[in-house]
Protein backbone atom coordinates (compact mmCIF):
# COMPACT_ATOMS: atom_id res chain seq x y z
CA UNK A 1 0.00 0.00 0.00
CA UNK A 2 2.85 2.36 0.81
CA UNK A 3 4.39 1.81 -2.62
CA UNK A 4 1.03 2.46 -4.22
CA UNK A 5 0.70 5.85 -2.45
CA UNK A 6 4.24 6.83 -3.53
CA UNK A 7 3.34 6.08 -7.14
CA UNK A 8 0.21 8.20 -6.83
CA UNK A 9 2.27 11.13 -5.49
CA UNK A 10 4.58 10.96 -8.49
CA UNK A 11 1.72 11.24 -10.99
CA UNK A 12 0.69 14.70 -12.24
CA UNK A 13 -2.43 16.25 -10.79
CA UNK A 14 -4.22 16.17 -14.16
CA UNK A 15 -4.03 12.37 -14.29
CA UNK A 16 -5.77 12.14 -10.92
CA UNK A 17 -8.83 13.95 -12.28
CA UNK A 18 -11.98 11.82 -12.59
CA UNK A 19 -12.22 12.87 -16.23
CA UNK A 20 -8.65 11.78 -16.97
CA UNK A 21 -5.96 13.85 -18.67
CA UNK A 22 -7.14 16.87 -20.73
CA UNK A 23 -7.66 16.49 -24.45
CA UNK A 24 -4.89 18.22 -26.46
CA UNK A 25 -7.44 19.43 -28.98
CA UNK A 26 -9.16 21.37 -26.21
CA UNK A 27 -5.93 23.09 -25.19
CA UNK A 28 -4.92 24.11 -28.72
CA UNK A 29 -6.99 24.91 -31.81
CA UNK A 30 -5.29 25.56 -35.13
CA UNK A 31 -8.45 27.10 -36.58
CA UNK A 32 -8.65 29.70 -33.80
CA UNK A 33 -4.97 30.51 -34.24
CA UNK A 34 -5.51 31.18 -37.94
CA UNK A 35 -8.57 33.29 -37.13
CA UNK A 36 -6.46 35.40 -34.78
CA UNK A 37 -3.87 35.80 -37.53
CA UNK A 38 -6.61 37.13 -39.82
CA UNK A 39 -7.77 39.53 -37.12
CA UNK A 40 -4.27 40.99 -36.69
CA UNK A 41 -3.62 41.19 -40.42
CA UNK A 42 -6.97 42.38 -41.81
CA UNK A 43 -8.99 43.68 -38.89
CA UNK A 44 -12.48 42.76 -37.60
CA UNK A 45 -13.99 42.35 -41.09
CA UNK A 46 -11.36 39.83 -42.21
CA UNK A 47 -11.76 38.00 -38.91
CA UNK A 48 -15.55 37.74 -39.29
CA UNK A 49 -15.19 36.51 -42.89
CA UNK A 50 -12.76 33.80 -41.80
CA UNK A 51 -15.14 32.63 -39.07
CA UNK A 52 -17.98 32.30 -41.57
CA UNK A 53 -15.82 30.47 -44.08
CA UNK A 54 -14.46 27.99 -41.51
CA UNK A 55 -17.82 27.76 -39.68
CA UNK A 56 -16.30 28.74 -36.33
CA UNK A 57 -18.09 30.35 -33.44
CA UNK A 58 -17.16 33.80 -32.15
CA UNK A 59 -14.70 32.95 -29.41
CA UNK A 60 -13.91 36.68 -28.87
CA UNK A 61 -16.49 39.27 -27.90
CA UNK A 62 -16.41 42.85 -29.14
CA UNK A 63 -14.44 44.17 -26.15
CA UNK A 64 -11.85 41.43 -26.50
CA UNK A 65 -11.44 42.20 -30.20
CA UNK A 66 -10.75 45.86 -29.40
CA UNK A 67 -8.30 44.91 -26.65
CA UNK A 68 -6.39 42.52 -28.91
CA UNK A 69 -6.11 45.10 -31.67
CA UNK A 70 -5.05 47.75 -29.15
CA UNK A 71 -2.38 45.53 -27.60
CA UNK A 72 -0.92 44.43 -30.95
CA UNK A 73 2.59 45.70 -31.70
CA UNK A 74 3.64 45.42 -35.31
CA UNK A 75 7.31 45.25 -36.34
CA UNK A 76 8.83 48.64 -37.00
CA UNK A 77 6.66 50.53 -34.51
CA UNK A 78 8.11 52.49 -31.60
CA UNK A 79 6.98 50.03 -28.96
CA UNK A 80 8.40 47.02 -30.78
CA UNK A 81 11.69 48.81 -31.46
CA UNK A 82 12.09 49.74 -27.81
CA UNK A 83 11.30 46.18 -26.75
CA UNK A 84 13.84 44.76 -29.19
CA UNK A 85 16.50 47.20 -27.99
CA UNK A 86 15.90 46.30 -24.37
CA UNK A 87 15.92 42.61 -25.24
CA UNK A 88 19.21 42.92 -27.11
CA UNK A 89 20.85 44.96 -24.35
CA UNK A 90 19.79 42.46 -21.70
CA UNK A 91 21.05 39.49 -23.71
CA UNK A 92 24.48 40.82 -24.62
CA UNK A 93 26.20 38.46 -22.17
CA UNK A 94 24.06 35.43 -22.97
CA UNK A 95 25.11 32.52 -25.12
CA UNK A 96 23.66 31.72 -28.51
CA UNK A 97 22.29 28.34 -27.43
CA UNK A 98 18.50 28.13 -27.28
CA UNK A 99 16.98 26.70 -24.09
CA UNK A 100 13.20 27.23 -23.95
CA UNK A 101 12.84 26.40 -20.26
CA UNK A 102 16.17 27.70 -18.92
CA UNK A 103 18.05 30.97 -19.14
CA UNK A 104 21.66 31.84 -18.48
CA UNK A 105 20.71 35.39 -17.41
CA UNK A 106 20.72 36.27 -13.74
CA UNK A 107 17.28 37.34 -12.50
CA UNK A 108 17.05 40.74 -10.78
CA UNK A 109 17.93 40.46 -7.12
CA UNK A 110 15.60 41.49 -4.34
CA UNK A 111 18.01 44.24 -3.32
CA UNK A 112 15.85 45.62 -0.51
CA UNK A 113 15.79 42.32 1.39
CA UNK A 114 13.49 39.34 1.68
CA UNK A 115 12.35 37.12 4.58
CA UNK A 116 14.71 34.17 5.08
CA UNK A 117 12.39 31.20 4.65
CA UNK A 118 14.03 28.10 3.24
CA UNK A 119 12.09 25.90 0.86
CA UNK A 120 9.47 23.86 2.66
CA UNK A 121 9.78 25.79 5.93
CA UNK A 122 6.75 25.56 8.16
CA UNK A 123 4.91 28.88 8.36
CA UNK A 124 2.10 27.88 10.62
CA UNK A 125 -1.39 26.56 10.22
CA UNK A 126 -3.35 27.90 7.29
CA UNK A 127 -6.05 30.39 8.25
CA UNK A 128 -8.51 32.23 6.04
CA UNK A 129 -10.17 35.58 6.68
CA UNK A 130 -12.71 36.77 4.10
CA UNK A 131 -13.84 40.38 3.53
CA UNK A 132 -16.54 41.55 1.18
CA UNK A 133 -17.51 44.96 -0.04
CA UNK A 134 -19.92 46.53 0.37
CA UNK A 135 -20.68 45.04 3.75
CA UNK A 136 -24.02 45.13 5.49
CA UNK A 137 -24.86 47.89 7.91
CA UNK A 138 -24.72 45.51 10.87
CA UNK A 139 -21.17 44.39 10.04
CA UNK A 140 -19.64 47.75 10.95
CA UNK A 141 -19.54 49.64 7.65
CA UNK A 142 -19.55 49.21 3.87
CA UNK A 143 -15.79 49.52 3.25
CA UNK A 144 -14.47 46.20 4.47
CA UNK A 145 -11.84 45.42 1.82
CA UNK A 146 -9.96 48.71 1.96
CA UNK A 147 -9.99 48.93 5.76
CA UNK A 148 -8.78 45.34 6.12
CA UNK A 149 -5.97 45.89 3.62
CA UNK A 150 -4.77 49.12 5.27
CA UNK A 151 -4.73 47.38 8.63
CA UNK A 152 -2.49 44.66 7.21
CA UNK A 153 -0.15 47.23 5.65
CA UNK A 154 0.25 49.08 8.95
CA UNK A 155 1.14 45.83 10.73
CA UNK A 156 4.06 45.04 8.39
CA UNK A 157 7.52 44.91 9.96
CA UNK A 158 9.91 43.54 7.29
CA UNK A 159 8.64 43.58 3.72
CA UNK A 160 5.55 44.34 1.64
CA UNK A 161 5.26 42.89 -1.88
CA UNK A 162 2.42 44.12 -4.11
CA UNK A 163 1.28 42.66 -7.43
CA UNK A 164 -1.52 44.77 -8.90
CA UNK A 165 -3.06 45.64 -12.23
CA UNK A 166 -3.85 49.30 -11.52
CA UNK A 167 -2.71 51.41 -8.57
CA UNK A 168 -4.19 54.88 -8.11
CA UNK A 169 -5.49 54.93 -4.53
CA UNK A 170 -3.81 57.80 -2.66
CA UNK A 171 -4.58 56.48 0.83
CA UNK A 172 -2.97 53.10 0.23
CA UNK A 173 0.11 54.68 -1.35
CA UNK A 174 0.54 56.96 1.66
CA UNK A 175 0.38 53.92 3.93
CA UNK A 176 3.14 52.28 1.89
CA UNK A 177 5.19 55.47 1.93
CA UNK A 178 4.82 55.76 5.70
CA UNK A 179 5.96 52.16 6.10
CA UNK A 180 9.10 52.92 4.07
CA UNK A 181 10.09 56.19 5.67
CA UNK A 182 9.08 55.76 9.30
CA UNK A 183 9.29 52.02 9.99
CA UNK A 184 11.97 51.05 7.46
CA UNK A 185 9.85 48.41 5.70
CA UNK A 186 10.99 47.36 2.22
CA UNK A 187 8.25 47.74 -0.41
CA UNK A 188 8.20 45.98 -3.79
CA UNK A 189 5.52 47.02 -6.30
CA UNK A 190 4.85 45.16 -9.57
CA UNK A 191 2.33 46.87 -11.86
CA UNK A 192 0.85 46.21 -15.26
CA UNK A 193 2.95 47.92 -17.90
CA UNK A 194 -0.01 49.35 -19.79
CA UNK A 195 -1.58 50.85 -16.65
CA UNK A 196 1.63 52.34 -15.23
CA UNK A 197 0.81 55.92 -16.38
CA UNK A 198 -2.06 56.01 -13.87
CA UNK A 199 0.41 55.29 -11.08
CA UNK A 200 2.78 58.01 -12.30
CA UNK A 201 -0.09 60.50 -12.46
CA UNK A 202 -0.87 59.75 -8.82
CA UNK A 203 2.80 60.26 -7.89
CA UNK A 204 2.76 63.58 -9.72
CA UNK A 205 -0.25 64.75 -7.72
CA UNK A 206 1.45 63.70 -4.47
CA UNK A 207 4.76 65.32 -5.53
CA UNK A 208 6.62 62.03 -5.13
CA UNK A 209 9.16 60.56 -7.53
CA UNK A 210 9.11 56.74 -7.35
CA UNK A 211 12.81 56.51 -8.28
CA UNK A 212 13.84 58.67 -5.30
CA UNK A 213 12.34 56.44 -2.62
CA UNK A 214 15.15 54.51 -0.91
CA UNK A 215 13.10 51.54 0.33
CA UNK A 216 10.60 51.32 -2.52
CA UNK A 217 11.08 49.57 -5.85
CA UNK A 218 8.54 49.90 -8.67
CA UNK A 219 8.77 47.59 -11.69
CA UNK A 220 6.45 46.56 -14.50
CA UNK A 221 5.20 43.16 -15.64
CA UNK A 222 3.08 41.89 -18.51
CA UNK A 223 0.94 38.89 -19.25
CA UNK A 224 1.63 36.24 -21.87
CA UNK A 225 2.91 37.37 -25.26
CA UNK A 226 1.43 35.93 -28.46
CA UNK A 227 3.65 36.06 -31.55
CA UNK A 228 2.08 35.94 -35.01
CA UNK A 229 3.77 34.68 -38.17
CA UNK A 230 3.82 38.20 -39.59
CA UNK A 231 5.97 39.44 -36.71
CA UNK A 232 3.13 41.10 -34.85
CA UNK A 233 2.93 40.35 -31.16
CA UNK A 234 0.08 40.75 -28.70
CA UNK A 235 1.02 41.54 -25.09
CA UNK A 236 -1.39 40.31 -22.45
CA UNK A 237 -2.43 42.16 -19.31
CA UNK A 238 -1.88 41.39 -15.64
CA UNK A 239 -4.92 40.33 -13.64
CA UNK A 240 -3.10 38.95 -10.62
CA UNK A 241 -3.84 40.86 -7.43
CA UNK A 242 -2.19 39.96 -4.16
CA UNK A 243 -0.18 41.64 -1.42
CA UNK A 244 2.43 39.65 0.49
CA UNK A 245 3.22 40.88 4.00
CA UNK A 246 6.34 39.73 5.90
CA UNK A 247 6.22 36.38 4.09
CA UNK A 248 3.57 35.06 6.49
CA UNK A 249 0.35 36.74 5.32
CA UNK A 250 -1.14 37.44 1.93
CA UNK A 251 -4.18 39.47 0.88
CA UNK A 252 -5.71 38.51 -2.46
CA UNK A 253 -9.03 38.86 -4.24
CA UNK A 254 -10.83 40.97 -6.81
CA UNK A 255 -10.10 44.24 -4.98
CA UNK A 256 -7.86 46.68 -6.89
CA UNK A 257 -6.04 49.69 -5.46
CA UNK A 258 -8.45 52.27 -6.88
CA UNK A 259 -10.94 54.67 -5.36
CA UNK A 260 -13.83 53.12 -7.29
CA UNK A 261 -13.08 49.64 -5.97
CA UNK A 262 -12.82 51.06 -2.47
CA UNK A 263 -16.03 53.08 -2.57
CA UNK A 264 -18.29 52.04 -5.46
CA UNK A 265 -17.54 48.64 -6.93
CA UNK A 266 -18.38 45.33 -5.35
CA UNK A 267 -15.27 43.30 -4.54
CA UNK A 268 -13.84 40.76 -2.14
CA UNK A 269 -10.57 40.29 -0.27
CA UNK A 270 -9.24 37.10 1.30
CA UNK A 271 -6.43 37.23 3.87
CA UNK A 272 -4.46 33.99 4.07
CA UNK A 273 -1.83 33.06 6.64
CA UNK A 274 0.21 29.95 7.30
CA UNK A 275 1.74 27.39 4.97
CA UNK A 276 -0.33 28.42 1.95
CA UNK A 277 1.62 31.71 1.77
CA UNK A 278 4.63 29.76 0.45
CA UNK A 279 2.97 29.47 -2.96
CA UNK A 280 2.44 33.24 -3.20
CA UNK A 281 6.03 33.78 -2.07
CA UNK A 282 7.29 31.66 -4.95
CA UNK A 283 4.93 33.30 -7.43
CA UNK A 284 6.09 36.79 -6.51
CA UNK A 285 9.75 35.86 -6.92
CA UNK A 286 8.97 34.40 -10.35
CA UNK A 287 7.12 37.56 -11.40
CA UNK A 288 9.88 39.77 -10.03
CA UNK A 289 12.45 37.84 -12.08
CA UNK A 290 10.34 38.47 -15.20
CA UNK A 291 9.73 42.15 -14.40
CA UNK A 292 11.37 45.15 -16.00
CA UNK A 293 12.26 48.56 -14.55
CA UNK A 294 10.17 51.58 -15.43
CA UNK A 295 10.79 52.53 -19.03
CA UNK A 296 13.16 55.46 -19.37
CA UNK A 297 11.15 56.61 -22.37
CA UNK A 298 8.01 56.85 -20.26
CA UNK A 299 9.84 58.78 -17.54
CA UNK A 300 11.31 61.12 -20.14
CA UNK A 301 7.81 61.81 -21.46
CA UNK A 302 6.72 62.82 -17.98
CA UNK A 303 9.78 65.06 -17.62
CA UNK A 304 9.17 66.66 -21.01
CA UNK A 305 5.60 67.40 -19.98
CA UNK A 306 6.98 69.11 -16.83
CA UNK A 307 5.11 66.70 -14.59
CA UNK A 308 8.10 66.12 -12.32
CA UNK A 309 9.72 69.57 -12.50
CA UNK A 310 8.75 70.29 -8.91
CA UNK A 311 10.92 67.37 -7.78
CA UNK A 312 14.12 68.87 -9.17
CA UNK A 313 16.65 69.79 -6.51
CA UNK A 314 16.81 73.55 -6.41
CA UNK A 315 19.42 74.53 -3.86
CA UNK A 316 19.18 78.12 -2.70
CA UNK A 317 22.13 80.26 -3.58
CA UNK A 318 24.40 80.65 -0.60
CA UNK A 319 24.91 84.19 0.62
CA UNK A 320 28.24 83.30 2.20
CA UNK A 321 31.50 84.01 0.32
CA UNK A 322 32.49 81.21 -1.99
CA UNK A 323 35.77 79.35 -1.85
CA UNK A 324 37.08 81.15 -4.90
CA UNK A 325 36.43 84.56 -3.35
CA UNK A 326 38.10 83.53 -0.11
CA UNK A 327 41.17 82.28 -1.97
CA UNK A 328 41.41 85.49 -3.99
CA UNK A 329 41.15 87.56 -0.83
CA UNK A 330 43.81 85.46 0.87
CA UNK A 331 46.17 85.90 -2.09
CA UNK A 332 45.49 89.63 -2.07
CA UNK A 333 46.41 89.85 1.60
CA UNK A 334 49.66 87.92 1.16
CA UNK A 335 50.85 89.59 -2.04
CA UNK A 336 53.41 92.40 -1.94
CA UNK A 337 51.35 94.56 -4.29
CA UNK A 338 47.79 93.60 -3.46
CA UNK A 339 44.73 94.44 -5.43
CA UNK A 340 41.30 94.95 -4.02
CA UNK A 341 39.30 91.72 -4.25
CA UNK A 342 35.98 91.91 -6.04
CA UNK A 343 33.08 89.98 -4.52
CA UNK A 344 30.59 91.19 -7.07
CA UNK A 345 29.03 94.24 -5.39
CA UNK A 346 25.78 95.67 -6.53
CA UNK A 347 26.01 98.05 -9.43
CA UNK A 348 24.83 101.57 -8.67
CA UNK A 349 21.53 102.63 -10.25
CA UNK A 350 21.81 104.08 -13.69
CA UNK A 351 19.90 107.22 -12.79
CA UNK A 352 22.41 108.05 -10.06
CA UNK A 353 25.98 108.84 -11.06
CA UNK A 354 28.64 107.65 -8.67
CA UNK A 355 30.65 110.71 -7.52
CA UNK A 356 34.41 110.50 -7.50
CA UNK A 357 36.58 112.04 -4.85
CA UNK A 358 38.80 114.69 -6.46
CA UNK A 359 41.88 113.74 -4.47
CA UNK A 360 44.03 110.70 -5.14
CA UNK A 361 43.62 107.29 -3.51
CA UNK A 362 46.87 107.75 -1.65
CA UNK A 363 45.69 110.90 0.01
CA UNK A 364 45.84 111.17 3.78
CA UNK A 365 43.09 113.74 4.16
CA UNK A 366 40.78 113.15 7.11
CA UNK A 367 37.52 111.69 5.84
CA UNK A 368 35.53 113.76 8.30
CA UNK A 369 36.94 117.00 6.94
CA UNK A 370 36.27 115.85 3.42
CA UNK A 371 32.73 114.85 4.35
CA UNK A 372 31.95 118.29 5.80
CA UNK A 373 33.51 120.08 2.85
CA UNK A 374 31.60 117.96 0.29
CA UNK A 375 28.42 117.28 2.19
CA UNK A 376 26.21 118.37 -0.69
CA UNK A 377 27.91 116.00 -3.11
CA UNK A 378 27.78 113.03 -0.76
CA UNK A 379 24.08 113.24 0.01
CA UNK A 380 23.04 111.60 -3.26
CA UNK A 381 25.76 108.96 -3.34
CA UNK A 382 25.52 105.48 -1.88
CA UNK A 383 29.10 104.36 -1.62
CA UNK A 384 32.53 105.96 -1.97
CA UNK A 385 35.97 104.41 -1.67
CA UNK A 386 39.07 105.82 0.00
CA UNK A 387 42.47 104.36 0.55
CA UNK A 388 42.84 105.39 4.18
CA UNK A 389 40.95 104.24 7.22
CA UNK A 390 39.63 106.90 9.57
CA UNK A 391 38.26 106.76 13.05
CA UNK A 392 34.45 107.04 13.37
CA UNK A 393 32.89 109.73 15.49
CA UNK A 394 31.52 108.79 18.87
CA UNK A 395 27.88 109.34 18.00
CA UNK A 396 28.06 107.09 14.92
CA UNK A 397 27.27 103.37 15.10
CA UNK A 398 30.18 101.03 14.40
CA UNK A 399 29.84 97.76 12.53
CA UNK A 400 31.93 94.71 13.43
CA UNK A 401 34.43 93.42 10.90
CA UNK A 402 34.04 89.87 9.56
CA UNK A 403 36.84 87.34 9.45
CA UNK A 404 37.23 87.49 5.69
CA UNK A 405 38.09 91.14 5.90
CA UNK A 406 34.95 92.49 4.28
CA UNK A 407 33.69 95.72 5.78
CA UNK A 408 29.97 96.17 5.25
CA UNK A 409 27.50 98.91 5.94
CA UNK A 410 24.37 98.44 8.02
CA UNK A 411 22.16 99.49 5.11
CA UNK A 412 24.31 98.83 2.06
CA UNK A 413 25.81 95.88 0.27
CA UNK A 414 29.52 95.27 0.46
CA UNK A 415 31.33 97.41 -2.11
CA UNK A 416 34.83 97.36 -0.71
CA UNK A 417 37.32 94.91 0.71
CA UNK A 418 39.47 95.75 3.68
CA UNK A 419 42.74 93.86 3.73
CA UNK A 420 44.75 94.67 6.80
CA UNK A 421 48.52 94.99 6.87
CA UNK A 422 50.12 91.71 7.90
CA UNK A 423 53.69 91.07 9.05
CA UNK A 424 54.78 89.54 5.75
CA UNK A 425 53.05 91.57 3.10
CA UNK A 426 51.80 95.03 2.46
CA UNK A 427 48.16 95.53 1.67
CA UNK A 428 45.66 98.16 0.71
CA UNK A 429 42.65 99.26 2.68
CA UNK A 430 39.29 100.59 1.61
CA UNK A 431 36.59 102.34 3.57
CA UNK A 432 32.85 102.28 2.99
CA UNK A 433 30.68 105.36 3.25
CA UNK A 434 26.94 105.34 3.75
CA UNK A 435 24.40 108.05 3.30
CA UNK A 436 23.14 108.09 6.86
CA UNK A 437 26.06 106.91 8.96
CA UNK A 438 29.74 106.23 8.53
CA UNK A 439 30.19 102.50 8.89
CA UNK A 440 33.92 102.33 9.49
CA UNK A 441 34.76 99.76 12.12
CA UNK A 442 37.21 100.27 14.88
CA UNK A 443 40.03 97.80 14.29
CA UNK A 444 40.27 96.00 17.62
CA UNK A 445 42.84 93.30 18.25
CA UNK A 446 40.11 90.68 18.77
CA UNK A 447 38.72 91.16 15.26
CA UNK A 448 41.96 91.81 13.39
CA UNK A 449 44.67 89.61 14.87
CA UNK A 450 46.89 90.03 11.82
CA UNK A 451 46.50 93.76 11.44
CA UNK A 452 49.54 95.88 11.94
CA UNK A 453 48.23 98.50 14.33
CA UNK A 454 50.01 101.35 16.00
CA UNK A 455 51.40 100.90 19.45
CA UNK A 456 49.48 102.07 22.48
CA UNK A 457 52.14 104.49 23.47
CA UNK A 458 52.52 106.17 20.11
CA UNK A 459 51.10 109.67 19.67
CA UNK A 460 49.20 108.62 16.60
CA UNK A 461 47.18 106.02 18.48
CA UNK A 462 46.36 108.48 21.22
CA UNK A 463 45.06 110.98 18.73
CA UNK A 464 43.04 108.31 16.88
CA UNK A 465 40.68 107.80 19.83
CA UNK A 466 39.99 111.49 20.25
CA UNK A 467 36.85 113.23 19.01
CA UNK A 468 38.71 114.79 16.10
CA UNK A 469 38.74 111.93 13.63
CA UNK A 470 42.39 111.53 12.69
CA UNK A 471 43.97 109.18 10.25
CA UNK A 472 44.83 105.75 11.72
CA UNK A 473 48.42 104.69 11.77
CA UNK A 474 47.58 101.50 9.88
CA UNK A 475 46.72 103.33 6.67
CA UNK A 476 48.78 102.13 3.79
CA UNK A 477 49.91 103.85 0.66
CA UNK A 478 48.02 103.06 -2.52
CA UNK A 479 49.57 100.91 -5.14
CA UNK A 480 49.73 103.88 -7.54
CA UNK A 481 52.93 105.04 -5.92
CA UNK A 482 54.61 101.63 -6.10
CA UNK A 483 55.70 99.25 -8.81
CA UNK A 484 52.70 96.91 -8.81
CA UNK A 485 54.20 94.09 -10.82
CA UNK A 486 57.50 93.72 -8.95
CA UNK A 487 57.91 91.61 -5.84
CA UNK A 488 60.90 93.55 -4.58
CA UNK A 489 59.75 97.01 -5.60
CA UNK A 490 60.61 99.80 -3.19
CA UNK A 491 58.03 102.46 -2.54
CA UNK A 492 59.77 105.61 -1.50
CA UNK A 493 56.93 108.06 -1.23
CA UNK A 494 57.80 111.02 0.91
CA UNK A 495 55.89 114.02 2.05
CA UNK A 496 57.46 116.15 -0.63
CA UNK A 497 56.00 113.91 -3.34
CA UNK A 498 52.51 114.57 -2.06
CA UNK A 499 52.81 118.33 -2.48
CA UNK A 500 51.45 118.40 -5.99
CA UNK A 501 49.97 121.54 -7.46
CA UNK A 502 46.75 119.72 -8.24
CA UNK A 503 45.76 119.44 -4.57
CA UNK A 504 46.87 122.58 -2.72
CA UNK A 505 43.61 122.85 -0.86
CA UNK A 506 43.45 119.47 0.84
CA UNK A 507 47.09 118.51 1.46
CA UNK A 508 48.08 120.33 4.55
CA UNK A 509 51.10 118.31 5.57
CA UNK A 510 52.42 120.87 7.98
CA UNK A 511 50.20 119.67 10.83
CA UNK A 512 52.04 117.60 13.47
CA UNK A 513 49.63 114.68 13.69
CA UNK A 514 49.70 114.07 9.94
CA UNK A 515 53.50 114.04 9.96
CA UNK A 516 53.48 111.51 12.79
CA UNK A 517 51.01 109.30 10.94
CA UNK A 518 53.04 109.39 7.75
CA UNK A 519 56.26 108.69 9.60
CA UNK A 520 54.68 105.78 11.45
CA UNK A 521 53.20 104.39 8.23
CA UNK A 522 56.52 104.45 6.39
CA UNK A 523 58.25 102.88 9.38
CA UNK A 524 55.77 100.02 9.48
CA UNK A 525 55.97 99.58 5.73
CA UNK A 526 59.76 99.34 5.80
CA UNK A 527 59.66 96.77 8.61
CA UNK A 528 57.15 94.62 6.76
CA UNK A 529 59.22 94.81 3.58
CA UNK A 530 62.34 93.76 5.45
CA UNK A 531 60.56 90.75 6.94
CA UNK A 532 59.20 89.86 3.52
CA UNK A 533 62.60 90.10 1.86
CA UNK A 534 64.18 88.10 4.67
CA UNK A 535 61.76 85.26 4.06
CA UNK A 536 62.45 85.29 0.33
CA UNK A 537 66.17 85.42 1.01
CA UNK A 538 66.04 82.38 3.30
CA UNK A 539 64.02 80.35 0.81
CA UNK A 540 66.42 81.18 -2.02
CA UNK A 541 69.36 80.23 0.17
CA UNK A 542 67.79 76.88 0.92
CA UNK A 543 67.07 76.23 -2.76
CA UNK A 544 70.63 77.10 -3.77
CA UNK A 545 71.99 74.82 -1.07
CA UNK A 546 69.93 71.93 -2.39
CA UNK A 547 71.09 72.62 -5.94
CA UNK A 548 74.74 72.72 -4.90
CA UNK A 549 74.38 69.33 -3.20
CA UNK A 550 72.87 67.77 -6.30
CA UNK A 551 76.00 68.54 -8.35
CA UNK A 552 78.15 66.45 -5.99
CA UNK A 553 75.75 63.52 -5.80
CA UNK A 554 76.97 61.76 -8.93
CA UNK A 555 80.62 62.07 -7.94
CA UNK A 556 80.35 60.63 -4.45
CA UNK A 557 77.59 58.04 -4.77
CA UNK A 558 77.49 56.96 -8.40
CA UNK A 559 81.29 56.76 -9.10
CA UNK A 560 80.93 59.20 -11.97
CA UNK A 561 84.04 61.00 -13.15
CA UNK A 562 83.39 64.55 -14.31
CA UNK A 563 86.03 64.34 -17.03
CA UNK A 564 88.57 66.87 -18.12
CA UNK A 565 86.35 69.93 -18.32
CA UNK A 566 87.03 72.98 -16.17
CA UNK A 567 84.46 73.82 -13.51
CA UNK A 568 83.86 77.54 -13.23
CA UNK A 569 83.70 78.93 -9.73
CA UNK A 570 80.42 80.66 -9.11
CA UNK A 571 79.47 82.61 -6.05
CA UNK A 572 75.98 81.39 -5.17
CA UNK A 573 75.43 84.31 -2.82
CA UNK A 574 75.91 86.76 -5.65
CA UNK A 575 73.44 84.82 -7.78
CA UNK A 576 70.94 84.99 -4.97
CA UNK A 577 71.42 88.73 -4.42
CA UNK A 578 70.99 89.53 -8.11
CA UNK A 579 67.28 88.60 -7.96
CA UNK A 580 66.78 90.46 -4.68
CA UNK A 581 68.44 93.75 -5.55
CA UNK A 582 67.98 94.58 -9.23
CA UNK A 583 69.60 97.81 -10.37
CA UNK A 584 67.25 100.73 -10.80
CA UNK A 585 68.02 103.50 -13.23
From Swiss-Prot:
Localization annotation: Cytoplasm; Cytoplasm, Cytoskeleton, Spindle; Cytoplasm, Cytoskeleton, Spindle pole
Residue numbers carrying Phosphothreonine: 511
Keyword Nuclease: no
Region (Required for interaction with KIF22 and function in chromosome congression): 337-585
GO cellular component, one term: cytosol
Keywords: Cell cycle, Cell division, Cytoplasm, Cytoskeleton, Mitosis, Phosphoprotein, Proto-oncogene
GO MF entries: kinesin binding; microtubule binding; protein kinase binding
Region (Disordered) location: 334-411, 425-482
SUPFAM superfamilies associated with the record: Phospholipase D/nuclease
Chain intervals with Polar residues compositional bias: 425-441
Annotated positions of the Phosphoserine modification: 295, 458
Domain of life: Eukaryota
GO biological process, one term: metaphase chromosome alignment
Segments of skewed composition (Basic and acidic residues): 347-360, 369-383
PTM comment: Phosphorylated during mitosis.
Chain segments carrying region DUF1669: 1-296
Keyword Phosphoprotein: yes
Biased composition (Low complexity): 458-482
InterPro entries associated with the record: FAM83, SACK1
Function text: Through the degradation of FBXW7, may act indirectly on the expression and downstream signaling of MTOR, JUN and MYC. May play also a role in cell proliferation through activation of the ERK1/ERK2 signaling cascade. May also be important for proper chromosome congression and alignment during mitosis through its interaction with KIF22.
Domain notes for this protein: All members of the FAM83 family of proteins share a conserved N-terminal DUF1669 (domain of unknown function 1669) domain of about 300 amino acids. This domain mediates the interaction with casein kinase 1 (CK1) isoforms. Therefore, it has been proposed to rename DUF1669 the polypeptide anchor of CK1 domain.
Assembly with partners or alone: Interacts with FBXW7; promotes FBXW7 degradation. May interact with RAF1. Interacts with KIF22; recruits KIF22 to mitotic spindle microtubules. Interacts (via C-terminus) with DYNLL1. Interacts with HMMR. Directly interacts (via DUF1669) with CSNK1A1 and CSNK1A1L.
Family: Belongs to the FAM83 family.
Identification of the protein by name: Protein FAM83D
Organism of provenance: Mus musculus (Mouse)
Gene that specifies this protein: Fam83d
